[in-house]
Structures are given as C-alpha cells and as structure tokens.
C-alpha cells in the first residue's frame, strides 16, 4: 500500500513528494484474510507469524524501504526470503539496443550466462550457454525456421571474449554481430531470452515485434 505523505507540516526534504510505503503483507492462499496473514509490515514495524503468536522482526523501517530490503533470512523469515527470491527471478526486457554502438555488436567477455542481460550485451555468451547446457536443438530450429540454411557459431577470441558468427546461404563468409541487421540481431536476442536454461515464472518482452520483419514473426511465435 503506497501513498503520498499525509503530514500537514512541511517536510524538510527535497523528497517530500516521494510515495511512502504504508503496508506490505504476505499471506497464504489466493485471497487476503487476516487468518491467512504470514508477514505484516504496518508503518515502521514488521512482524511475522510464529505458530500462534507474532514475532517482531523490525521496528524502525524507513517509509521508503520495502520489507524485502530489511528482512528475509531463511531462518527468521522464510516467507519473505522465498517471496523475494521468487520475484528476483522475474525478467523484464524493455529494450534491446541494436544501434551501431550497442555493446551486443562487440565481442564480450565470455562467462556462463544462463540468463540474458536486460540489454542483451552478453548475447554471445548466452547463446553458447544454451548450446552447452540448454536446448540447443530448439535454438538451431528457431534460427533455421527464420533464416533457412543459416547457422550460428560462437567464436572464442583472445582474452576470453566471445563473438557471434552468423552463416547465411549465399554468403562466402560469416557475418559478425556488427554486420547483422537490426531485425536479425533482435531475433537472436529474443531467441536467447526465450530459450534460457533457467526459465522464470514471469517474463515480460516489451513490443518484441519492433524492428522485426513480418516474415520473422511466425518463427518467433513458434
């Protein structure tokens, strides 16, 4: 429960218009009921149900901090811990940069990447991770479905950097990420996001059709 400050007196802060957190609740079941309440943050105090009594976990929480920032150990408040970890696994891909200066167009340090970065900069590592521990067949099928005869290779360069090599029918050499069209690059980014070896409970893709050729949309949907 968020709301603006109710104090009629002037607040000596430049952040006086920030919303304040008044109430946070974690409960069991599909609907809130007082009897199903497990963790309750009311104003500055956080309490958790312990059998038939309530344990106070914190008493002086700033009104701009969530209970997830203040408590949440597996031992003292497992409900907060589990809910926080559940939310942390959500993925939001608002915008993949594909301009000439975008990091995804340059070789990047290659480390195991089961989750694509929100801006896609670690695309090469994410694709290689799918090849090694994910559904490599689905990835190859998604690429050939959109680009018949095409194939992908991740090149290991000096210094541990990974680079994308995209082979297409009719071309004598592979294309680097810097040479790919915006649509092709965005398609590969979406494939890497959707075929993650660690699928989240919630994934949000903002306007995934942006910059994609209409012919690629059926392949993306499949």
Residue ranges, per PLM feature:
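Electropositive, glycine-dotted interaction segments
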Residues: 1-137, 141
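Switch/communication elements of ASCE P-loop NTPase nucleotide-binding domains
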Residues: 149-152, 156-222
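ABC-family P-loop ATPase nucleotide-binding domains
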Residues: 133-157
């Amino acid at each position: 429960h968020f709301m603006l400050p109710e104090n009629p007196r002037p607040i000596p802060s430049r952040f006086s218009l920030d919303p304040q957190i008044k109430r946070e609740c974690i409960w069991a079941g599909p609907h809130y009921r007082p009897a199903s309440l497990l963790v309750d943050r009311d104003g500055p105090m956080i309490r958790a149900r312990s059998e038939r009594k309530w344990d106070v976990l914190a008493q002086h929480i700033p009104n701009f901090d969530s209970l997830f920032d203040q408590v949440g150990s597996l031992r003292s408040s497992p409900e907060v811990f589990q809910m926080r970890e559940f939310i942390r696994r959500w993925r939001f891909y608002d915008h993949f940069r594909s301009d000439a200066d975008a990091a995804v167009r340059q070789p990047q340090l290659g480390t195991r990447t089961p989750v694509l970065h929100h801006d896609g900069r670690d695309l090469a590592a994410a694709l290689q991770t799918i090849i090694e521990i994910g559904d490599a067949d689905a990835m190859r099928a998604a690429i050939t479905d959109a680009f018949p005869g095409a194939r992908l290779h991740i090149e290991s360069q000096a210094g541990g950097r990974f680079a994308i090599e995209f082979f297409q029918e009719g071309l004598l050499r592979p294309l680097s990420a810097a040479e790919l069209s915006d649509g092709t690059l965005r398609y590969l980014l979406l494939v890497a996001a959707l075929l993650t070896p660690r699928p989240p409970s919630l994934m949000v893709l903002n306007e995934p059709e942006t910059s994609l050729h209409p012919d690629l949309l059926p392949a993306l949907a499949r």
